[in-house]
Amino acid sequence: MIKITFPNTSARNYAIGTTPMQIAESISCRLAEEILSANVNGEMWDLSRPINENASVKLYKWEDFEGKRTFWHSSAHLLAESLQELYPNIHFGMGPAIENGFYYDVDLGDGVVIKDVDLVTIEKKMQELASKKLSISRQNVTKQNALELFGKKGETYKIELISKLEDGKITVYTQGNFTDLCRGPHLPNTSYIKAIKLTSVARAYWKGDESRKQLTRIYGISFPKKEELSEYLALMEKAKKRDHRRIGKEMELFTFSHKVGRGLPLWLPKGTQLRLRLEDFLKRIQKKYGYQQVITPHIGNKTLYIASGHYAKYGKDSFQPIHTPELGEEFLLKPMNCPHHCEIYKAFLRSYKELPLRLAEFGTVYRYERSGELQGLTRVRGFTQDDAHIFCSPEQVKEELIKVIDIVRVIFCALNFNDYEVQISLRDLNNRIKYIGSEENWKNSEGAIIEVCQEKKIKAKIKLGEAAFYGPKLDFMVKDALGRNWQLGTIQVDYNLPERFELEYVGADNQKHRPVMIHRAPFGSMERFVAVMIEHTGGKFPLWLVSDQVVILPVSENYNQYAEEIAKEFHKRDIRVTIDKRNEKVGRKIRDNELKKIPYLLIIGEKERRNSEISVRKHGKENIGIMKVTEFAEFLKKEVERQMSQWQ
């Protein structure tokens, strides 16, 4: 018999070779119908794969992130099998699950092109194969067998992948007439996939390398119920109207350039103003809580990230090292700010009287995201984190968590993110060996997080086994106007980096002690936060934050001078104003500036100039009426003060 322990610490005994599906069936028939994959001792697992030793087991359903990834990964294989039947000369690249759905990169051969109209035919083939309930089976193969298997098929891309794999750790999955190189896990069979939509076709270089061949990339999404697909498509129609890429272009916030590089946003003047105001907003809040700003370089010696463990984690996702010819050193574009802040802490011998030490930075970091995963500002290769690290004694952890939560809640209130959930990630108590740090510290920090949420009356979901190996964490999941969840604020307790960097402070007992490190980033990254904020508000930012609060629309160029006089008066009062001097009809000017989401449109003509007045129109609404310039300026000032009073 083997002992199976569940996330809630309960345990049952099962026969050796029991599968996750059999475990689910022993609990309830409904659970067996709903589970999609499992996690066994930290490894993702097929439902039909035997378990031969004592294990901690989690069962994943569609509602779980891991369940969706399994579902979409199997959907990518279903797409590949369908393409194999429709295009016999096809060769396959890679087909992963992504954040919302899946894709597969394929080489169709010279002259063969898949267009959007062809997607319907491919969808029908996928639905046909799904309905056949084809079993999906896993097989361990030797490296030589894998090379022979895919070599016979002429799968050159797979051969290239296999050549870099370690022998003894290679698996293939088969469904129907299709076999793919894959780690898994996968669904038990294709019938789980009830609804499919192929969303687009694109071109992508093999492995994201522009010197390699361009492949055809087909994107799609799938669901276990047809009504879920209908709901998703309806949501996507609404989302198109709020797409941050479209609105960002209309509002002149940011752009991208292929010459600069994919996934590297360029912030335009209005977008830069927006970002700087967000940064200033957070800096002012942090100053009240005793944070000190620091600045660190964009690169670091490779040995720094080896010492921190980030190279082991992000090495494959990092850009290639930069070599210095004279000394032979290797530098990396910074993947995280944490190691740099640890070195700042180590610059001096610290006393307990200096703690907590709170270091904050808007630090730009770099990750090599695959080209297929890049999306506007939400997935980029260079992004700025509102990073801060708190170095404190174990006794100070609870108090610091309270203060960080206060900061996060102020930010969410100020920016109208009022609907959010909180998730506490704790240890797997049945697998304590994988965690670093003393039992006492873990108990104290986990207890502190739970107590803080209770004191703050935060209804938090507890996720056992979801903590990082170096400490528990608190995640804030914000729901936007379309009902989508976004992870924005994260608070992480860390015992690992202080240990790796041998951080110390001298205690009241004159002995050296190890501090605790708390990571926090309320925005997450500036790029992603701005994208979420655009889609949540539709670009209608709070008046205190928006780049242009007012636009003046002269009905003809005869009134440009009067517009300049008004703008000069507004500038004296710190009102952000622009003038639309184009030789266009006023109706066109109104429409164009409505798209830019400028809160107030001021129309001026002969009557307004003669009486030193302005005709005021609010974005998205009819005219407010005629006002004196000073009267409107005072009105605007009070509106800004009203909004800011909610969080100052």
Curated annotation (Swiss-Prot):
<dbReference type="InterPro" id="IPR018163">
    <property type="entry name" value="Thr/Ala-tRNA-synth_IIc_edit"/>
</dbReference>
<dbReference type="Pfam" id="PF00587">
    <property type="entry name" value="tRNA-synt_2b"/>
</dbReference>
<keyword id="KW-0862">Zinc</keyword>
<dbReference type="GO" id="GO:0046872">
    <property type="term" value="F:metal ion binding"/>
</dbReference>
<dbReference type="InterPro" id="IPR036621">
    <property type="entry name" value="Anticodon-bd_dom_sf"/>
</dbReference>
<dbReference type="GO" id="GO:0000049">
    <property type="term" value="F:tRNA binding"/>
</dbReference>
<dbReference type="InterPro" id="IPR002314">
    <property type="entry name" value="aa-tRNA-synt_IIb"/>
</dbReference>
<keyword id="KW-0436">Ligase</keyword>
<dbReference type="InterPro" id="IPR006195">
    <property type="entry name" value="aa-tRNA-synth_II"/>
</dbReference>
<keyword id="KW-0479">Metal-binding</keyword>
<feature type="domain" description="TGS">
    <location>
        <begin position="1"/>
        <end position="61"/>
    </location>
</feature>
<dbReference type="InterPro" id="IPR012675">
    <property type="entry name" value="Beta-grasp_dom_sf"/>
</dbReference>
<comment type="similarity">
    <text>Belongs to the class-II aminoacyl-tRNA synthetase family.</text>
</comment>
<keyword id="KW-0030">Aminoacyl-tRNA synthetase</keyword>
<dbReference type="GO" id="GO:0006435">
    <property type="term" value="P:threonyl-tRNA aminoacylation"/>
</dbReference>
<dbReference type="InterPro" id="IPR045864">
    <property type="entry name" value="aa-tRNA-synth_II/BPL/LPL"/>
</dbReference>
<protein>
    <recommendedName>
        <fullName>Threonine--tRNA ligase</fullName>
        <ecNumber>6.1.1.3</ecNumber>
    </recommendedName>
</protein>
<feature type="binding site">
    <location>
        <position position="389"/>
    </location>
    <ligand>
        <name>Zn(2+)</name>
    </ligand>
</feature>
<keyword id="KW-0963">Cytoplasm</keyword>
<dbReference type="InterPro" id="IPR047246">
    <property type="entry name" value="ThrRS_anticodon"/>
</dbReference>
<keyword id="KW-0648">Protein biosynthesis</keyword>
<dbReference type="InterPro" id="IPR002320">
    <property type="entry name" value="Thr-tRNA-ligase_IIa"/>
</dbReference>
<feature type="region of interest" description="Catalytic">
    <location>
        <begin position="243"/>
        <end position="542"/>
    </location>
</feature>
<keyword id="KW-0694">RNA-binding</keyword>
<dbReference type="InterPro" id="IPR012676">
    <property type="entry name" value="TGS-like"/>
</dbReference>
<dbReference type="GO" id="GO:0004829">
    <property type="term" value="F:threonine-tRNA ligase activity"/>
</dbReference>
<dbReference type="Pfam" id="PF07973">
    <property type="entry name" value="tRNA_SAD"/>
</dbReference>
<keyword id="KW-0067">ATP-binding</keyword>
<dbReference type="Pfam" id="PF03129">
    <property type="entry name" value="HGTP_anticodon"/>
</dbReference>
<dbReference type="GO" id="GO:0005737">
    <property type="term" value="C:cytoplasm"/>
</dbReference>
<keyword id="KW-0820">tRNA-binding</keyword>
<dbReference type="Pfam" id="PF02824">
    <property type="entry name" value="TGS"/>
</dbReference>
<keyword id="KW-0547">Nucleotide-binding</keyword>
<feature type="binding site">
    <location>
        <position position="519"/>
    </location>
    <ligand>
        <name>Zn(2+)</name>
    </ligand>
</feature>
<comment type="function">
    <text>Catalyzes the attachment of threonine to tRNA(Thr) in a two-step reaction: L-threonine is first activated by ATP to form Thr-AMP and then transferred to the acceptor end of tRNA(Thr). Also edits incorrectly charged L-seryl-tRNA(Thr).</text>
</comment>
<dbReference type="InterPro" id="IPR012947">
    <property type="entry name" value="tRNA_SAD"/>
</dbReference>
<dbReference type="InterPro" id="IPR033728">
    <property type="entry name" value="ThrRS_core"/>
</dbReference>
<feature type="binding site">
    <location>
        <position position="338"/>
    </location>
    <ligand>
        <name>Zn(2+)</name>
    </ligand>
</feature>
<dbReference type="GO" id="GO:0005524">
    <property type="term" value="F:ATP binding"/>
</dbReference>
<dbReference type="InterPro" id="IPR004154">
    <property type="entry name" value="Anticodon-bd"/>
</dbReference>
<dbReference type="InterPro" id="IPR004095">
    <property type="entry name" value="TGS"/>
</dbReference>
<comment type="subunit">
    <text>Homodimer.</text>
</comment>
